[in-house]
């Protein structure tokens, strides 16, 4: 069982306002760092409580960091996520880093430096391109469009989207197919069922010589 928490920069952005924190990163960086230290301490304790309660790990959602430049992400997000990972991750409790921004490929170095056990990316990026940057021993997950397919798509369209991602990415043994983010409310069960059916279809076809 995995728990979920918001990431440090994303939490700070909720507290300050997204637009304001973007400005403060340039105009008052020291203040942003103070807030990030406090946010990181809070999230760390939150993760420890999940760990003590018996969770097997936690997903740290850091989507607002996807709005930063690679340089700013390396300063204001990655190191703070790493502090959390270093404090809570071990063989019995894993951290999955989530970022659904469209610049994650450009900032992948600082993302990988967090040391998370696995990484999850949204549909704003080319997942096949992302996989070329992921070390072979590290799991990466993604990235069927949650809103466009699970919420607003059809069984036929989500089948095509799922098979498309898998065709492009399953040559990497460390790739795991998933939605690109949370499944939106009111998503139709037939679309969710179609996603899993497509996954089964892909692997059945692979076993029979598909691809």
Across the structure, where does each feature detected by a protein language model lie?
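Active-site loop segments of alpha/beta catalytic cores
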Residues: 1-211
């Amino acid at each position: 069982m995995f728990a979920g928490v918001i990431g440090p920069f994303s939490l700070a952005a909720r507290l300050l306002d997204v637009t304001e924190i973007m400005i403060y990163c340039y105009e008052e960086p020291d203040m942003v760092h103070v807030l990030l230290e406090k946010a990181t301490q809070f999230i760390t304790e939150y993760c420890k409580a999940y760990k003590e309660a018996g969770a097997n790990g936690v997903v740290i959602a850091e989507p607002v960091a996807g709005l930063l430049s690679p340089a700013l992400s390396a300063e204001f997000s990655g190191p703070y996520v790493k502090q959390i990972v270093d404090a809570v991750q071990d063989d019995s409790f894993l951290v999955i880093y989530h970022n659904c921004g469209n610049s994650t490929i450009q900032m992948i170095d600082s993302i990988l430096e967090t040391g998370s056990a696995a990484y999850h990316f949204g549909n704003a990026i080319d997942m096949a391109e992302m996989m070329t940057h992921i070390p072979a021993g590290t799991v990466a997950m993604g990235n069927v469009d949650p809103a466009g397919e699970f919420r607003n798509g059809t069984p036929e369209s989500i089948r095509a989207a799922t098979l498309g991602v898998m065709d492009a990415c399953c040559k990497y043994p460390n790739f795991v197919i998933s939605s690109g983010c949370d499944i939106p409310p009111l998503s139709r069960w037939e679309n969710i069922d179609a996603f899993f059916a497509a996954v089964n279809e892909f692997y059945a076809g692979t076993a029979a010589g598909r691809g």
